[in-house]
Amino acid sequence: MKMIFEAPATVWQEAFPLGNGRIGALMFGDGEAETLCLNEDTLWSGYPGDPRTGMGYEDIKKAEVYAKEGSYLQATQVLNQAQETAEDVEMYEPFGTVRIWFEGEREIADYHRELDLETATARVTYRNHGQSYEHRCFCSAPSQVLVYQIRAEEAFTIVITADGGFLTGNSWDGKIWKMQGQMPGKSKIPVEAKEGDGSEFIFSENPQEKGMPYEGWCMFETENGEIVPTEMGVRCVNVHEITMRILIRSGFAGVSRHPYTQGNDPAKLLLQDQEQTGISVEELWKEHVGEYQKLSLIHISEPTRL
């Protein structure tokens, strides 16, 4: 079964979701640009500490008394007032957003995008000035890698950047584009925070108050052309095909371990992941599909049309 659309997705709510249980992505675009919103299941702000803020046992008991009396409004008010001082000291956070921009004037026609539910693969096809393009994306659990490809009948140039989340910088070592990030140490944003109330994330220079480090690596394979590093990312010039293999790791080492002083080194974990992605892209895809289809325990069918 496939989800098929004949129009681009312009916002993330219309994106195709992809993931492998640890790495997640939302893929959307319009033929002139593509966006990959990325996350990873261990990316949290904060660090181990006293989890009790705001609402306490006494507040709950007081609300219980009101509720038993049928005074539900008063019970709700008690809980809401207690929540006003509660802090979200540990919040699930995104990795960031990778953006792919096509250079030059584009004239898009015959746009088609689909999410194949039987292979967990997203595909986009269209024509630019009459020349065929195909985008493909999947997220492998066996190899722990997100693969994104563009193939075309003509040479094209794209600019790739990363922003959002808590990314702090990027670098190019001649082979790998590396994205680095640092989670906040604590969030001073109350549960009942209102927009513009001055609350903010806390970034401390004290190692004991630092948040979790994280990193993403992107390895490129191209047909023709060249890859040129830029201040914000990379530029792939006059290529006919490009494959991006994206790896993500955080410093998470357990819920009771400090993510900065006792955490893992993301770079070491990425080196281990890199060793698993040495096979060809088609082998990665077949491996991904084989593992994914082991979970095919149900069948979805369309209702009978009258």
Where are these regions (language model features)?
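Acidic/polar, glycine-enriched structural segments that form the non-catalytic walls/loops
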Residues: 1-301, 305
